Amino acid sequence: MKTMTCKQLGGPCDLAHHGDTADDVIKAQDAHLRDAVAQADAAHDPALKDMKGRWKHPISGMGWYRKAKRDFAALPED
């Protein structure tokens, strides 16, 4: 298991996401951003918009995805 923070994934805070794969932490980040914005946390709004943009434009979003996967792979196990 490895840990990445919201900030490491492009968000504004240091909330830790844990997972066995990069996809696990990316999914946790997506849920965190949606929850934070739903609770009127304006600081997370730009990151949520960026995330939605990656889903709407998957080819251009692949650069972010590949970087997140590389960053995750480089992390030590918890």
Give the residues covered by each predicted segment:
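Metal-centered catalytic cores of metalloenzymes
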Residues: M1-D78
